[in-house]
Each structure stands twice: as structure tokens, then as C-alpha cells.
Amino acid sequence: YSRVIATYRTVLEDCVIYHKSLNYEQLLSDTKELYYSCKTSLELFDMLHNMRSVEDSVYAHSLNVSLISRRLGRWLKFSPEELDTLTLAGALHDIGKLKIPVEVLNKPGKYTDEEFALVKQHPKFGYDILKSLPLDSHVKKAVLCHHERSDGSGYPTGLSQSDIDEYAAIVSIADVYDAMTAARS
């Protein structure tokens, strides 16, 4: 688990901070290896609960969302190719957060209105990073739309039900689940 978080840190920072190519094959390979090391859903969720590293919250959270998304896709009978796309969507869903200053992102307590407005831009920042890359459109839509809600109350564009990509909806569920079960301040 810790090794894969280190991979996420390296791959995502190399892309966003150092402007290197996105090594999404490495993210997918390492995530799948970790996923298949868990024999059951219980073992997977137990690992997520017990192994979270608070200091690497963006990276641990991205890994967790990727693993949970893959499990949800398996339950929904996705094909192997669809599972890989969904796994990558989960892995990259918060890549835009790397464009937000660390002191804002890791601030304990509530954000100011200005800080929250900035944090709410991370889906758009992420989409802008990925839009020209040769990734499945579901990955890009999941990155952009994982905070959209079926009632139209989400962001960044306030999409509702049928306008939200299926992969984005699944990543959104995984994202909310992981956030709700995290020990965050």
C-alpha cells in the first residue's frame, strides 16, 4: 500500500509539477496489483481502513478511490477494459488538487469562502491537465464531473442526473465513501 502511494506521488507530481508525461500505465499496473492482492471485498476495505496515511492524504485518497471504484465496477459487471478505465478515472480524479497551494489544501478546519472557491476549481484544473492526453473520455469526464450531483447541486457546472457520465457517478460514490470513512480534521 505504501509503495503504491509513493508511485502515485511520483507519477502525479512528475506530470503536474515537473511537466513530464503522465505515466498512467504505472498507476494502473500498481493499483491492479494491489487490488488483486486482496482476495475479498472485506479484505480490500479492511486494508483501506487500516493502511491510510494521513500525511499523504491526496495520494492515499486517490489510491483508495481508484480501488473502491474498481470494486464497484466489478459489482456492476464491468468488462476488464471498462474496469481499467474506471480504475484510472479513480486514480486521476483529484489530479487537479496538485494545482492548489498545499497550505490551502492541507489547512485544518473550515476553508474561507475564497479558499473553498479555489478548492472547487480542482475538477476543472484536473480536466485541463488531462484534456489533450490520449485517455478514454470517461476518465476525463470523471475528473471533471466527480463533484456533480444528481440533483444539480454539484460543481463545477451543476449537471444533473442523466447528464453525468456513469464513470463520474461511480468515482463520485467512491470519493464520498472514502472521505466519509477517513480520519481527517
Task: Report residues per predicted region.
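Non-catalytic interface/linker regions that flank or bridge core catalytic/transmembrane domains
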Residues: 1-52, 56-57
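Signal-transducing alpha-helical linker
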Residues: 3, 23-26, 39-43, 87, ...
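A short mid-domain helix/strand-loop element embedded in enzyme catalytic domains
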Residues: 28-47, 64-67, 92-101, 147-148
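Divalent metal-dependent catalytic cores for phosphoryl transfer on phosphate-bearing substrates
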Residues: 48-53, 60-61, 78-142, 178
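Alpha-helical phosphate/pyrophosphate-handling elements in metalloenzyme active cores
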Residues: 55-86, 158-163
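Buried hydrophobic packing segments
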Residues: 69-73, 126, 130, 173
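Histidine/acidic-rich helix-loop-helix segments that form or flank divalent-metal centers
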Residues: 90, 130-132, 136-171
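Conserved beta-strand-loop-short alpha-helix elements that form
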Residues: 169-182
